[in-house]
A protein has these predicted regions:
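Phosphate-group recognition and catalysis centered on beta-loop-alpha active-site segments
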Residues: 1-264
């Protein structure tokens, strides 16, 4: 069983402040999510942990981008997986910023940690190859809703790389049956990343957080943009908060003397 305390990725004091897509609702970043500009703004605020999603182009280049297609936030159209890197490279987010490759982000922010949601099966092997070739095993935590994808990533990269649980593994961890909770804890994950609530269901109950901690798992909660929720979760003892409102989370943590980021 891989526990968070064993991995260099988690070498920061908890709670980890994690910039979702670079801080998509931070005023300078609005309309420029997942750009090098947005990530630089998060780093300037003192963030060390940056969240992004990845897709791979037709020729295997890994891009930091949320959607499967370019249509919503760029001046181009088409599915990334069906386009070559030369085509993806011409797209501009918000009409101005290029879509960064994951390799470019690794190089641009050498002190940052990256929480990476691998969005499609076609991006699994290119992402694993990139982590190996850049020797960034200690700087990434890989995530996916898909258990199949996250298991493939664990097989390709081994236990030295942090991973979160897939959805089915989280369901097992929430089971009232101890056997299934223990089974989930042995999946190879080092953290669990969940929403605070799904509809009327509260996911991050005190019992759930305590059970995750009992198995050595960190609990990170997404995507938390309301200050009262941030305060509630910090009181609950979660280990990380993923937010679009990076300035608000920073202020909350500073007020509680829990901000451990670089000066910004």
């Amino acid at each position: 069983m891989t526990v968070a305390a064993d991995l260099p990725y988690f070498d920061h004091a908890v709670p980890l402040p994690i910039a979702h897509r670079g801080g998509a609702l931070y005023e300078p970043n609005v309309g420029l999510e997942n750009t090098r500009y947005a990530f630089a703004n998060a780093v300037d605020l003192g963030y060390r942990y940056l969240e992004t999603d990845v897709h791979a182009s037709r020729d295997g280049v890994v891009y930091a981008f949320h959607d499967s297609s370019l249509d919503r936030v760029t001046d181009r159209s088409g599915r990334i997986a069906a386009l070559g890197a030369d085509q993806v490279g011409r797209a501009r987010i918000g009409g101005r910023e290029p879509i960064p490759t994951l390799a470019e982000l690794f190089e641009a922010f050498p002190d940052a940690r990256f929480n990476i949601d691998v969005k499609e099966a076609s991006a699994v092997e290119p992402t694993a190859r990139l982590v190996r070739s850049t020797k960034t095993h200690d700087r990434v935590c890989l995530a996916s809703f898909s258990v199949d994808r996250i298991r493939r990533l664990r097989r390709l990269l081994g236990p030295r790389v942090a991973t979160s649980m897939g959805t089915a593994e989280v369901v097992q961890l929430r089971s009232p049956i101890g056997f299934f909770r223990r089974l989930a804890a042995r999946c190879g994950a080092s953290c669990v990343q969940v929403p605070h609530r799904v509809g009327r269901l509260t996911v991050t109950t005190p019992d759930f957080v305590a059970e995750a901690h009992r198995f050595g798992l960190q609990v990170h909660v997404w995507t938390v943009n309301d200050v009262p929720d941030m305060i509630e979760l910090l009181d609950l003892g979660v280990d990380g908060i993923i937010t679009d409102r990076i300035d608000a989370l920073r202020d909350v943590l500073m007020a509680r003397e829990r901000w451990d980021g670089a000066p910004g």
